[in-house]
Swiss-Prot record:
GO cellular component: cytoplasmic vesicle; endosome; plasma membrane; trans-Golgi network
Pfam families in alphabetical order: Cation_ATPase, E1-E2_ATPase, Hydrolase, PhoLip_ATPase_C, PhoLip_ATPase_N
Top EC class, one word: translocase
Role this protein plays: Plays a role in regulating membrane trafficking of cargo proteins during embryogenesis. Regulates snx-3 retromer-mediated endosomal sorting of mig-14, a transporter of Wnt egl-20 morphogen. Together with mon-2 and pad-1, may participate in the formation of endosomal carriers that direct mig-14 trafficking back to Golgi, away from lysosomal degradation. Required for Wnt egl-20 gradient formation along the anteroposterior body axis and migration of QL neuroblast descendants toward the posterior part.
Name of encoding gene: tat-5
Protein name (record): Probable phospholipid-transporting ATPase tat-5
Organism: Caenorhabditis elegans
Residues at the active site: 442 (4-aspartylphosphate intermediate)
Length: 1074
């Protein structure tokens, strides 16, 4: 014993070959031999009397780091680009000081790595995680003879397996990106040369200043200023769904000077220079100018976003010719491509915490073993060797198992026929779906269909609903026929209908003999379709003119032509749109405007009915728009034209200057024509879905930008507010005192469904953020109206801050929901007809709201429960073998000798047990039907009982018990040769692990049976082939089988009995419904 304490230790068993380093260190070799001799002489003396304790583990999942490393490498090894404006000349490229500037190439590169950086970056990404770094250090320590434990393959094998899978996955993903990039860079386009001829050019070879030709249904390869189209009117429609997610066609206008040229070759003969601002991210703004010099004549013109085609948009009509102003990384599409922050699931964080506990346990257990052995000058070597021996407590394969499981969950959700076209865009957080406590939902397009139907028009003195629209048509036709006085009621109705038919951005498209309408908003399409039903049809529209087809009482058709002078498009900031038209029959010039009542009420002449009727319509659940007009004299038009042109030519603050001119000169003293009401119908099965989610313990909040009355109406009709709810509407809050009073009023009520305007929310959060979180979260349902996109995200952050660790999900369908979706723990986007922004930004994409029930209650449950079981079994697998190792060391005087050698240790966690444990990802504790029928089952998941410190301790105790039984049992029943201890204990260990998996299964699947059979068969073959580890004659005897069976029965039977009794006398909820 004294000699052994003075020397360093190595690993071996008496009948196993010692793994000694090839180093010539005589001290180390002599120590190993001495240690082996002592172990061999002590085995028979210490087979009956010892007990030991062990531990349990979990591996840390890390989802946040990869993108950071990618950014780091780019920032370290790439030169910072300086963005600046540029002036390009048609046919000559950049001119002036820009002629010497090297602009970014037009190559598309989405690859993370190149051939040299691939291995270093991937390895860096992996070893920055503590778990992988820990195992790397353990593996490297095996090259030090003094602390070597067994064969290096024991430690390098699992680490190499994990790294190989990671490298293969990353290489495959990057190769797919490379192929996609190569296809885009190799696309062919036509370029105009100085002499006007066309040549073919690759997309990657396009440069700033090139004049290129883009045909219909082709991708725009760079940001170009539109010079000419084949459409006679000069209209060019583009699809922007790959840029901003919106599926409606956008109208783009070429430069008038070049559009009027006879053919495209004439463009190259112009002395034309285009100035473009420095590259920026805003896809809705562009500042530029165009200058054409012809002898002594200089023509200047302004350029805005309507004159530009952004890269990655698609030409939807005709052929376009444009000059390239931005390429490559300076294009709007690339500058708006941000790497979203990776989300980390709560389960991953819990597993990470358990991993830290296990690491601490390894240190404590190793320290105890060293202390029990006795401290001397070489204690640190003993400590290192014990840490190496017990390193299996921290299973390196856990992270790989969880990552593979997440990919399987994503595949399974994607092919669920009950929720078709569901897309998983973030495969790292499927378990989050199983623990949602708050669901924040948009209204329009999410709870409602975003299919608008015109329902009501109010003219101040009389209102017409859908059942009286035929009467409206009679009035309008009579007015156009000229039978009534100018100021009669019919004439007023005519003016209102005509204004609705003209004030929009709708374009009729004729395809295959049918007419369809393209517009940015479904509200506008609903209005135009309604005017058609009452006899005023939008016949045609181009950049400069619009025609209406009016049905007269005698059956004839009257065509009215209007010249479009100016269009002021709708934005979410202005909440209105306007148009100035000139009637070509009467030469009357009129400004027509429509918009939200909140902004239009301050622009129209005094009236006593607008606010009241807006509230009435909102209570009916209708979306309202105020329509108004203002006749303009020629002098007023000319004055506006001069001021507006001057604002358009400004380089800085152009948009603001233009808006100021419009507001100052036009948006005053408008004549109120009518108030329109459009209905947005509820999505299919919304009411039953909300009830199902509420029964599942999920609190549902509706966040909308609509009016208070409309929001309340939809909340009631959808079932968000139940009949028993006491609806509390927040009053006007302007200051801290108001907020304090309103919050006190709310505090005194119970079973409250809260309605809070966005303005009140802002004030309350400014002064009483914590109190708002406490009181609002206690409400049964919450509706926030007049909510901006920023406020939606702010509400999500409020819940995340004050209700952690409860999980928050957000669901929406539009661009205004993106910030909310990205801020939530789980973002769900609805793939809407009008746009894909929310769908593309979300973690999960569905096609309708009702699908969220199956996504959460079925797939969310399965993902969470399966990952919990998988994590605990991987930890159990490492704990049980470490328990056996600890007992083995204690029996033999705390020797740091490995119980199992080389291939056995590697195969234990891979070939023999990996498939059965991983097969738990197809287990189901309840059927999908029962999960939806009994939504109350979902409530229990939020408590986190499937993986908690309690369950962790239970599995630790199970591992300690089974490890002790197997190890002590093997020592008790073996006869003479120590190799029999290895055979019996390792066989009992493998069979116990397979039986434990089988005992955990709730619903058997063919993949589980196959995994069990393959693993058991592979191990039985190993018993025959690995004669260096097993005595072939012994393992084929009945003695071996009986001893192994007995030990396995003692380790598993008591646990089975306890489980059976528990299911009989205290069954879990899922067992009751089954």
């Amino acid at each position: 014993m004294g000699k052994r304490k003075k020397n360093d230790e190595s690993s071996s068993s008496s009948s196993q070959k010692p793994c000694v380093s090839s180093s010539s260190d005589d001290f180390s070799v002599s120590f190993v031999r001495a240690e082996e001799d002592d172990v061999a002489t002590t085995i028979r003396d210490k087979t009956a009397s010892l007990k030991s304790n062990a531990t349990h583990f979990s591996a840390a999942s890390a989802a946040k780091g990869g993108m950071f490393d990618f950014r780091c490498c780019r920032s370290l090894f790439s030169r910072r680009r300086v963005l600046h404006s540029r002036t390009v000349r048609v046919g000559y490229g950049p001119v002036g000081h820009d002629a010497n500037v090297t602009f970014t190439p037009n190559t598309v590169c989405n690859q993370k790595y190149n051939i040299f950086s691939f291995v270093p970056i991937v390895l860096f990404q992996q070893f920055k995680f503590f778990l992988n770094l820990y195992f790397l250090l353990m593996a490297c320590s095996q090259f030090i003879p003094a602390i070597q434990i067994g064969a290096p393959i024991t430690y390098w094998g699992p680490l190499g397996f994990v790294l190989t899978i990671t490298l293969i996955r990353e290489a495959f993903d990057d190769f797919v990106r490379y192929l996609r990039d190569r296809d885009l860079n190799s696309e062919k386009y036509e370029k105009l040369t100085r002499d006007g001829t066309r040549i073919e050019i690759r997309s990657a070879d396009i440069e700033v200043g090139d004049v290129i030709i883009m045909h219909k249904d082709r991708r725009v390869p760079a940001d170009v200023v539109l010079l000419r189209t084949t459409d006679k009117s000069g209209a060019c429609f583009i699809r922007t769904d790959q840029l901003d997610g919106e599926t409606d066609w956008k109208l783009r206008i070429p430069v008038p000077h070049t559009q009027h040229l006879p053919n495209e070759a004439d463009i190259m003969e112009l002395n034309c220079e285009v100035y473009a601002e420095k590259p920026q991210k805003d896809i809705h703004a562009f500042v530029g100018t165009l200058k054409i010099t012809d002898d002594d004549n200089v023509q200047d013109g302004s350029l805005n976003v309507e004159n530009v085609l952004w890269a990655n948009t698609v030409v939807a009509s005709g052929t376009a010719v444009g000059i390239v102003v931005y390429t490559g990384r300076e294009t709007r599409s690339v500058m708006n491509t941000t790497l979203p922050e990776s989300k980390v699931g709560l389960l991953d964080l819990e597993v990470n915490n358990l991993t830290k506990l296990l690491f601490c346990f390894v240190l404590v257990l190793s320290s105890v073993m060293v202390a029990m052995k006795g401290l001397d000058n070489l204690w640190y070597r003993y400590l290192m060797r014990f840490i190496l021996l017990f390193s299996y407590i921290i299973p390196i394969s856990l992270r790989v198992n969880l990552d593979m499981a997440k990919l399987f969950y994503s595949w399974q959700i994607g092919r669920d026929k009950h929720i078709p076209e569901t897309v998983i865009r973030s495969s790292t957080i499927p378990e989050e779906l199983g623990r949602i406590s708050f669901l924040l939902s948009d209204k329009t397009g999410t709870l409602t269909k975003n299919e608008m139907h015109f329902k009501k028009i109010h003219l101040g003195t009389v209102a017409f609903s859908s059942d009286a629209f035929e009467e409206v048509g009679q009035h309008v036709r009579s007015a156009y026929a000229g039978r009534l006085a100018k100021h009669s009621f019919s004439a007023k109705l005519q003016n209102a209908v005509e204004a609705i038919a003209l004030c929009h951005n709708v374009t009729p498209i004729f395809e295959n003999g049918e007419i369809s309408y393209q517009a940015a908003s479904p509200d506008e399409v609903a209005l135009v379709k309604w005017t058609e039903t009452v006899g005023v049809r939008l016949a045609s529209r181009d950049l400069h003119a619009m025609s209406l087809s009016v049905q007269l009482p005698n059956g004839q058709t009257l065509m009215k032509q209007f010249q479009i002078l100016y269009v002021f498009p709708f934005t979410s900031e202005t909440k209105r749109m306007g148009i100035i038209v000139k009637d070509e029959t009467t030469d009357e010039v009129t400004l027509l405007m429509k918009g939200a009542d909140t902004v239009m009420s301050g622009m129209v002449q005094y009236n006593d009915w607008l606010d009241e009727e807006c509230s009435n319509m909102a209570r009916e659940g209708l979306r309202t728009l105020v329509v108004a007009r203002k006749p303009l004299s020629q002098a007023e038009l000319e004055a506006f034209d001069r001021a507006y042109h001057a604002a358009k030519m400004s380089i800085s603050d152009r948009s603001q200057n233009m808006a100021n001119v419009v507001n100052r000169m036009l948006e005053r003293d408008l004549q109120l024509l009518c108030l329109t009401g459009v209905e947005d119908r509820l999505q299919d099965q919304v009411t039953t879905s909300l009830e199902l989610l509420r029964n599942a313990g999920i609190k549902i909040w509706m966040l909308t930008g609509d009016k208070l009355e409309t929001a309340i109406c939809i909340a009631k009709s959808s079932g968000l507010f139940s009949r028993s709810d006491n609806i509390h509407v927040f009053g006007n809050v302007h200051n801290r005192t108001d907020a304090h009073n309103e919050l006190n009023n709310l505090r005194r009520k119970t079973d409250v469904a809260l309605v809070m305007p966005g303005s009140a929310l802002n004030v309350c959060l400014q002064y009483y953020e914590a109190e708002v979180a406490e009181l609002v979260c206690a409400c049964t349902a919450v509706v926030c109206c007049r909510c901006s996109p920023e406020q939606k995200a702010q509400i999500v952050q409020l819940l995340r801050k004050y209700r952690a660790p409860l999980r928050v999900a957000a669901i929406g369908d539009g661009g205004n929901d993106v910030s909310m979706i990205q801020a939530a723990h789980a973002g769900i986007g609805i793939d809407a007809n009008e746009g894909k922004q929310a769908s593309l930004a979300a973690d999960f994409s569905i096609t309708q709201f009702s699908h969220v029930c199956r996504l959460l209650l079925v797939h969310g449950r399965f993902c969470y429960k399966r990952s919990c079981a998988l994590s605990q079994f991987v930890m159990h697998r490492g704990l049980i073998i470490s328990t056996m190792q600890a007992i083995f060391s204690c029996v033999f005087y705390f020797a740091s000798v490995s119980l199992y050698q080389g291939v056995l240790m590697v195969a234990y966690s891979t070939c023999y047990t990996m498939l059965p444990v991983f097969s738990l990802v197809v287990d189901r504790d309840v059927t999908a039907t029962n999960a939806l029928t009994y939504p109350e089952l979902y409530k229990e998941l939020g408590k986190g009982r499937s993986l908690s410190y309690k369950t962790f301790c239970i599995w630790v105790l199970i591992s300690l018990y089974q490890g002790a039984v197997i190890m002590y049992g093997a020592l008790l029943v073996f006869d003479a040769d120590f190799i029999h201890v290895v055979s019996i204990s390792f066989s009992a260990l493998i069979v116990t692990e397979l039986i434990m998996v089988a005992m955990t299964v709730h619903t058997w699947h063919w993949a589980m049976l196959l995994a069990q059979a393959l693993s058991l068969g592979l191990y039985m073959i190993s018993l025959i082939l690995f004669d260096q580890y097993f005595d072939r004659q012994f393992v084929l005897s009945w003695v071996f089988i009986s001893k192994t069976t007995a030990i396995t029965a003692v380790s598993c039977l008591p646990l089975y009995i306890v489980k059976a009794l528990r299911r009989k006398f205290s069954p879990p909820s899922y067992a009751k419904v089954n």
